[in-house]
């Protein structure tokens, strides 16, 4: 026992006299550890919160220490161990805004220039047509409800404008004006990340001219609006997510039941079935065959866009399968609590935060004496200055691809693409949906 005391003199031992087993996480088998000084011992991890690790020694005692007192290899092990631990996922039942609290103000109106600017708490949107008060409040409510939804879902998005105080949008009076303003051919709306702008023609959301102002018509719908706003809310995530996650999350939010400014997340299954019925009744191709996962998971943005341009049938498959995957990981996989999805976004989020820090370091670097920023955005600097380094995961296109492949393993959870697809088909069959 004296040798044990010498060996672990730097650890603080906590002897648990009576601890309910149900309160503790599953203890893993013992493994070999080393202190920072190189002393070896055997123990199992009981818990690690990122600051303090609790170990179970071979004699049953519990010991607490900080990672810095362990070897570099053991510190790396703890980081990976923590990533694998369950997250307490809180799935919201209903998310929305109180209509009475909605701020929807007129900033400016210019009938000659067809430019009407409106502002809500988090959005500023420019319309080519004047909105009546009912439509203005409805649009404002849906914009703000989408913001609240992205805050509440267990993805840790933390939506904020790409720049400035407000998310920006442009609404066009018809498709011709939409295309002339930079809209995407064949689309019902688009979020252009380079311009930080959501663009949509009135017809895509069911708005028509009534007298001298625009109002809702019988086809008023929110799917396109919510889909593209989701992209806008996730502006700072899009560079770190594969395209199937980018589009799948937007399809998922766009299908959630939305009534009077409230998304019913608990009724996501109703949205799923409505989506399937829409495909059956209102599209010529019907319900698409799922896109092969072994092709979908590694697809690049360039390859995705090539499919959209050249193959309408495969395009439908891409969006449909992306939605199926996100819905599955949110509601059907394992216990149906979105656990793997939350862990996936936590891992991606850690790198995104590192990239955000790098971006700020670069901004500060460019302000230093000896750095010259050119009109095209490029810059030169003196050789005695040290350029900030980006996170290794995003340093090169190859590193980014490797990072996406690594984080995919969180969702696969030891399954092959074929095994996952088999489980997906089985889960949807139980809902009455045959794929």
Placement of each model-derived feature along the sequence:
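Compositionally biased alpha-helical segments
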Residues: 22-157, 181, 188, 276-279
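Acidic/His/Gly-enriched intrinsically disordered linker/tail segments
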Residues: 190-202, 220, 240-435
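Juxtacatalytic substrate-recognition/specificity segment
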Residues: 112-243, 259
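Extracytoplasmic/secreted envelope proteins and their assembly/folding machinery
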Residues: 30, 42-45, 75, 140-147, ...
């Amino acid at each position: 026992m004296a040798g044990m005391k010498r060996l672990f003199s730097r650890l603080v031992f906590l002897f648990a006299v009576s601890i309910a087993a149900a309160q503790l996480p599953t203890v893993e088998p013992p493994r070999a550890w080393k202190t920072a000084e190189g002393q070896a011992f055997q123990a199992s991890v009981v818990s690690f919160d990122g600051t303090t690790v609790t170990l179970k020694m071979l004699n049953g005692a519990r010991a607490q220490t900080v990672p810095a007192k362990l070897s570099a290899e053991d510190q790396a092990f703890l980081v990976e161990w923590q990533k694998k631990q369950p997250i307490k996922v809180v799935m919201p039942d209903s998310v929305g805004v109180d209509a009475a609290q909605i701020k929807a103000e007129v900033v400016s109106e210019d009938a000659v220039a067809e430019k009407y600017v409106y502002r809500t708490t988090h959005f500023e949107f420019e319309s080519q047509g004047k909105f009546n008060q009912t439509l203005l409040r409805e649009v404002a409510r849906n914009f703000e409800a989408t913001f609240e939804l992205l805050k509440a879902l267990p993805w840790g998005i933390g939506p904020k404008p790409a720049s400035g105080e407000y998310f920006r949008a442009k609404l066009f009076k018809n498709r011709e004006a939409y295309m002339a303003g930079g809209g995407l051919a064949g689309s019902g709306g688009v979020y252009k990340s380079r311009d930080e702008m959501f663009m949509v023609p009135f017809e895509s959301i069911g708005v028509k001219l009534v007298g001298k102002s625009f109002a809702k018509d019988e086809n008023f719908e929110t799917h396109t609006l919510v889909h593209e706003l989701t992209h806008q809310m996730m502006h700072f995530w899009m560079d770190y997510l594969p395209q199937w996650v980018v589009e799948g999350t937007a399809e998922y939010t766009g299908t959630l039941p939305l009534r009077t400014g409230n998304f019913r997340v608990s009724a996501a299954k109703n949205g799923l079935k409505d989506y399937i019925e829409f495909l059956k009744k209102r599209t010529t191709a019907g319900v698409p065959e799922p896109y092969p996962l072994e092709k979908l998971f590694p697809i690049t943005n360039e390859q995705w866009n090539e499919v959209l341009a050249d193959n309408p049938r495969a395009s439908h498959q891409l969006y449909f399968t992306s939605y199926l995957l996100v819905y599955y990981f949110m509601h059907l996989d394992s216990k149906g609590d979105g656990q793997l999805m939350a862990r996936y976004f936590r891992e991606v989020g850690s790198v995104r935060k590192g990239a955000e820090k790098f971006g700020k370091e670069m901004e500060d670097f460019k302000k230093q004496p000896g750095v010259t920023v050119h009109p095209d955005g490029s810059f030169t600097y003196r050789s005695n200055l040290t350029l900030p380094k980006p996170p290794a995961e995003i340093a090169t296109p190859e590193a980014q691809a490797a990072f996406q492949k690594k984080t995919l393993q969180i969702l696969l959870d030891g399954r092959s693409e074929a095994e996952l697809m088999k489980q997906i088909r089985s889960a949807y069959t139980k809902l009455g949906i045959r794929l």
